[in-house]
């Protein structure tokens, strides 16, 4: 999963082209001679997708092996270039955080921007690096991943207990937690299952 670029743009309905307010990209996985062309292409596609994203809307556009996600919050638009495997919910969560941070840092000054800004915004570069892992952008995904890891550990623990030479049958017989009826049910179910396996 890879984020190639993040852009923040002013998308005014009366303007012909969106104005780039901030831009961060990581094109290190491209060949050295391709990098400048890739950056130009990111700006072109980002501007095009942003201009076609209506206010208060989100959209995703497939382009080759990339998805371009855009979120236009009343004229302030965030665009992200991610690979196909980056979860959509995490992508939009990241774009939402980028817009929140931009408005905290710059307020409404973006409304008066008339031309592209070349001034770097450190937060956007940090976000590009930090959110390469989608779980950082999406807290629910992070919690789900932790639960999955816990479940894997639990399965390993049960398997290791049974792998020490103890059999489930002997554990059932020794258990004081199970009533005689439960023990009989277990033995009967095991006989029934073994009967079916032979057939």
Swiss-Prot record:
Q: GO CC terms on record? A: plasma membrane; SNARE complex
**What is the protein's species of origin?**
Arabidopsis thaliana (Mouse-ear cress)
Q: Which SUPFAM superfamilies match?
A: SNARE fusion complex (SSF58038), SNARE-like (SSF64356)
Membrane topology category: Lipid-anchor
**What keywords tag this UniProt record?**
Cell membrane, Lipoprotein, Membrane, Methylation, Palmitate, Prenylation, Protein transport, Transport
Write down the Gene3D superfamilies for this protein, in alphabetical order.
Answer: 1.20.5.110, Longin domain
Reported tissue expression:
Expressed ubiquitously in roots, stems, flowers and leaves.
Kindly indicate whether the keyword Lipoprotein belongs to this entry. Answer: yes
PANTHER family associated with the record: SYNAPTOBREVIN HOMOLOG YKT6 (PTHR45806:SF1)
Where is it localised?
A: Cell membrane
Stated role: May be involved in the secretory pathway. Essential for membrane fusion mediated by either SYP41 or SYP61; triggers the fusion of phospholipid vesicles containing SYP41 or SYP61 and VTI12.
From the UniProt record, report the name of the gene that encodes this protein: YKT61
Output this protein's name.
VAMP-like protein YKT61
**Record domain Longin: where:** 7-133
Query: Sites of S-geranylgeranyl cysteine lipid linkage?
Result: 196
Family designation: Belongs to the synaptobrevin family.
Q: Which GO terms describe its biological process?
A: protein transport; vesicle fusion
Propeptide part(s) removed at maturation, as residue ranges: 197-199
Q: Which domain of life is it from?
A: Eukaryota
Q: According to the UniProt record, list the residues that bear Cysteine methyl ester.
A: 196
Q: Does the keyword Lipoprotein apply?
A: yes
Lipid addition sites, S-palmitoyl cysteine? 195
- Subunit structure and binding partners: Interacts with SYP41. Core constituent of the SNARE complex required for membrane fusion at the trans-Golgi network.
Name where it mostly resides.
Answer: membrane
């Amino acid at each position: 999963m890879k984020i190639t670029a993040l852009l923040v743009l002013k998308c005014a309905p009366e303007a012909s082209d969106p104005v780039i307010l901030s831009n961060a990209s990581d094109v290190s996985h491209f060949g050295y001679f391709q990098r400048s062309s890739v950056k130009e292409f990111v700006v072109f596609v980002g501007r095009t997708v942003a201009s076609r994203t209506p206010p208060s809307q989100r959209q995703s556009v497939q382009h080759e092996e990339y998805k371009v996600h855009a979120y236009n919050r009343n004229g302030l638009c965030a665009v992200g270039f991610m690979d196909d495997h980056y979860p959509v919910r995490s992508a939009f969560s990241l774009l939402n955080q980028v817009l929140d941070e931009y408005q905290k840092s710059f307020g409404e000054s973006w409304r008066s921007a008339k031309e592209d800004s070349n001034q770097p915004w450190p937060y956007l570069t940090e976000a590009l690096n930090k959110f390469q892992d989608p779980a950082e952008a999406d807290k629910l995904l992070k919690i789900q991943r932790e639960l999955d890891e816990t479940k894997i550990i639990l399965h390993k623990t049960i398997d290791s207990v049974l792998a020490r030479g103890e059999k489930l049958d002997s554990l059932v017989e020794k258990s004081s937690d199970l009533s005689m009826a439960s023990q009989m049910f277990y033995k009967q179910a095991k006989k029934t299952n073994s009967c079916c396996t032979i057939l």
